Amino acid sequence: MGVCFLFNKAGEILVPFRTWRNNITEEASNALTELFNYNIPQRWSIAHLYQAILNKEEHVKDIDYIATLEAYVHWKLTGEKVLGIGDAAGMFPVDIEKKDYNQSMIDKFDGLAAPYGFSWKLRDIMPKALVAGEKAGCLTEEGAKLLDPSGKLKPGIPMCPPEGDAGTGMVATNSVARRTGNVSAGTSVFAMIVLEKELSKPYKEIDIDRKSTRLNSSHT
């Protein structure tokens, strides 16, 4: 979906979280789209992060973890800083062959941020991307208490990689095979189409932002 939570080493949130409706990142979005030759929508986590850098926001130097809502909740329940590949692709572009963040683009971003002298590198502060079926941790005692303060819920329940609503909708409508798709008519209206191959070039109207084992595009 594209949400940005920023935390320091103590696990404290640095600024109020920024949602997919905070369209305040046009400068960063345009700059990163040009740098990567890949459409970076304003709502993506990486656009929010780079806009904070461009704005010279004081907290950026203290970032230890950047998360979406799904990654944040999973972290609180399991202690694991991981994210399903679909939601991870709404943070930063992913490599559909390696099923991980695109390393060449990470290197480009680190080069872009280098003159600012931050102690962190991008990959170090993002949740690890996991695909469906991979182990994503178990419910901890602390997590169980968050869900059920009465103590009846016990820890140890295995957890799957956390995902957002778009991937959930694709599974629910059985739209996961190539050349299939679905239309969401919720908070926003968009089509989610599973493509057969990469697009030949970036299009502002098409976000390549939801990938599990397929390449999907959402038209907003």
Language-model regions: role of each:
Residues 1-217:
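Glycine-rich phosphate-binding/catalytic subdomain of phosphoryl-transfer
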